Amino acid sequence: ANCLVGSEMCIRDSSIIVAGMGGSAIGGDIVSVLEKECIDIPFFVCRGYSVPNWVNKNTLVICSSYSGNTEETLAALDDSIIKGAQVCGVTTGGSLAKKLKIENKDVVIIPSGLQPRAALAYSFVPMIKLLQKIGILDTKIDSWLPDVIESLLNDRELHSQDSKENPIFGLADKIYNRIPIIYSDNSTVNVAALRLKGQICENSKMLCYHNDLPELNHNEIVGW
């Protein structure tokens, strides 16, 4: 990916927001997991047309839109600029890249030609690099990436096999003609559960629902 650097970002922000929708927001969700261990300032993912009223000049808003034409993200960008936030973007181009260039702001241009949900790494890794650049994340995270890539490659090989040993076949058989409900705790695996729910809905064209613990213990559990 290419980083077109405009005006200098501040070295330290008081809060960070990722504005995005669907597959373009999941990268921010993954980064938010790091907040518990590696990020010592507030980090939020906003899915919608605006950002919170407390956003100001000390807030960094990262606008993530694979196509660059997501209307909610473009509106959130405009709202962020009005509120004086520092803004940047991760996109393949479109109106988002054009607006950021006009504003002389940073934009990471990532490869096009994919479905947004298949471009997770292209939205996630640039955010990591950006936060390292401005001193929010330690560079030690770079040492994790090769292990993650190797693990994903090994899993892909296993899950691509046409055999009974492939655990994905068993899972697919269990949820066929059903409505899956995915429960997770609200720590690190919550993002994985949300991602799985989205993948089932978009790739399999079927309904799927997700909730997390311990919140569901106070309401949804009664429905069972």
PLM features: residue spans?
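A short linear-motif detector with a strong N-terminal bias
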Residues: 2, 22-24, 40-43, 86-87, ...
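Glycine-rich phosphate-binding loops that contact phosphosugars or nucleotide phosphates
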Residues: 12-154, 173
